[in-house]
């Protein structure tokens, strides 16, 4: 049973990665679908014109919010599995580490390099 636990972790990691990438592709919205074709519009309450730039930004943020949430969850899960990126780098250079685990450590280090939590840890 102990020998199968890394295999289960790898299978879970691959499944979570596929779900995150599938949601990333599914939530991409073209700007022509978000913003109406006319550049400005009038509101019923006030007679002044409102540019559509703000609505485009808010709709785009709403569209990408689930993917950002899942990426943060994935980084959290990987940080519990591998530790900090510095720990993962140290384990990767160890002569006793396996090649498959090193592949996932590289993926983890690549996804965690832009994360706020890890950038705060590096600056301390």
From Swiss-Prot:
A motif (RxLR) lies at residues 57-60. One of its GO terms (cellular component) is host cell nucleus. Its main location: secreted. It is found in: Secreted; Host cytoplasm; Host nucleus. Has a conserved RxLR motif that acts to carry the protein into the host cell cytoplasm. Lacks the 'so-called' EER motif, which is found closely behind the RxLR motif in most of RxLR effector family members, but the presence of an EER motif is not always essential for the translocation of every RxLR effector into host cells, or for inducing a hypersensitive response. Belongs to the RxLR effector family. Effector that acts as a broad suppressor of cell death to interrupt plant immunity. Inhibits cell death induced by cell death-inducing proteins, including the PAMP elicitor INF1 from P.infestans. This is Secreted RxLR effector protein 49.
């Amino acid at each position: 049973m102990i020998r199968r636990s890394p295999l289960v972790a790898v299978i879970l990691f691959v499944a979570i990665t596929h779900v995150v990438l599938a949601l990333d592709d599914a939530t991409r919205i073209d700007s022509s679908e978000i913003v109406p074709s006319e550049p400005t519009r009038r509101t019923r309450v006030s007679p002044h014109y409102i540019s559509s730039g703000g609505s485009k930004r808010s709709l785009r943020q709403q569209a990408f919010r689930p993917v950002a949430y899942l990426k943060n969850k994935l980084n959290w899960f990987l940080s519990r599995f591998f530790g900090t990126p510095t720990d993962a780098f140290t384990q990767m250079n160890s002569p006793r580490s396996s090649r498959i685990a090193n592949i996932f450590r590289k993926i983890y280090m690549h996804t965690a390099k832009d994360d706020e939590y890890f950038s705060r840890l590096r600056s301390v």
